[in-house]
């Protein structure tokens, strides 16, 4: 799950890259060492040539594509986009895909919510700990938090 990026691209930079701004729900695969890292973009983002972006565009469910990529490992040091493009994706009929999305989509949303909650709790801990240690704040003062 990719909730945010470390760096932000400028409009000028976005105009110079071929990938453009990729939509939320894009499945990303690192194609250079380290190869095989996989994530689902939960925010629009831009990538460099070290990634393969699988935009589902409603043709296939993001969760199905994610699970398909996780099920197909690799031992290569690098995979080019040219070598990746002809790979065939075998997928079930729409009824089964819909059932899959109902189950796995709910689980994925829960995972995303838990990651967000964990990030908020980490931020709260990082903000409160120094104040508690220094005595600037006491536990009794934060009971309502």
Provide a role label for each language-model segment.
Residues 20-22, 46, 80, 105, ...:
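Solvent-exposed alpha-helices and their adjacent loops that cap or buttress functional pockets
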Residues 59-60, 83, 87-145:
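Amphipathic alpha-helical coiled-coil/heptad-repeat segments
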Residues 31, 45-52, 71-98:
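A short glycine-rich beta-alpha junction/loop motif
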Residues 11-31, 37, 58-68:
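Polybasic, glycine- and aromatic-enriched phosphate-binding surface used to engage nucleic acids
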Residues 52, 66-70, 130:
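Generic alpha-helical structural context detector
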Residues 1, 35-38:
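Flexible loop/turn segments at secondary-structure boundaries
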Residues 12-13, 53-54, 111-112:
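Short, contiguous acidic/charged loop-to-helix segments that flank catalytic cores in large enzymes
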Residues 1-24, 42, 47:
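Sequence-specific dsDNA recognition surfaces
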């Amino acid at each position: 799950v990719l909730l945010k990026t470390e760096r932000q691209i400028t409009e000028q930079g976005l105009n110079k890259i071929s990938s453009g701004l990729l939509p939320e729900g894009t499945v990303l695969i690192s194609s250079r060492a380290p190869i095989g890292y996989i994530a689902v973009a939960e925010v629009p983002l831009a990538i460099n040539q070290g990634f393969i972006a699988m935009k589902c565009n409603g043709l296939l469910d993001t969760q199905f594509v994610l699970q398909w990529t996780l099920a197909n490992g690799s031992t290569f040091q690098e995979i080019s986009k040219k070598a990746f493009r002809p790979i065939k994706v075998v997928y079930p009929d729409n009824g089964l895909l819909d059932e899959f999305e109902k189950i796995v989509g709910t689980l994925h949303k829960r995972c995303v919510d838990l990651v967000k909650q964990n990030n908020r709790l980490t931020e709260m801990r990082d903000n409160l700990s120094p104040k508690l240690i220094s005595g600037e704040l006491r536990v009794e003062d934060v009971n309502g938090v």
